[in-house]
Amino acid sequence: MKTKVLKQALFFTFLSICLFVSTTAFGQKVNLSGNWKLNEGKSQLGEGRFRMAPATVNITQDETTLNMERTSKGQNGQDFTSKEKYTLDGKECENTGFMNSVKKSTVTFSSDNKTLTITSTTTFEREGNKMEIKQVENFKVSDDGNTLTLDASSTSQRGERKQTLVYEKAK
């Protein structure tokens, strides 16, 4: 009788440990941290004259914050780096961008925590006209941690634009 009770207690203890480990391992949110370099051959830059993408993206992420530095070539051929800071609590945050634009963004995670989504609205003035760009960026890291894929779409007065950017972790 004592052996049966002991076996049941041991079984439920083991089951509880397995359940805890599996929910901890599978519940972990994607972490985008790393220095990433664009693989132009694997990327789809979209159509039109704005076929450009950051050549490098450097990301640091902790439990509450995502910091991102995107470096692109400017029109004059020199590097241009934009720095953005996002909160991971689902609340709106603001970043200042090109032409004194204001980018309001919210970060969310997919239900399986494998995709980080940044939903943004950027407002700015150009030649006296107020402009607005709405953007959704979905970031995923490959299982081996060496590839970052960014599916991005944006909408403005000039139409819709879609890109799939593939970055490889810099060695």
Predicted regions: what they are:
Residues 11-22:
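Bacterial N-terminal signal peptides
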Residues 7-8, 36:
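Short helix-onset patch at the extreme N-terminus, typifying the N->h transition
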Residues 26-171:
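Hydrophobic small-molecule pocket/channel-lining residues, especially in calycin-type beta-barrels
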Residues 1-7:
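N-terminal secretory signal peptides that target proteins for export/translocation
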Residues 8-11, 74:
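General helical structural elements
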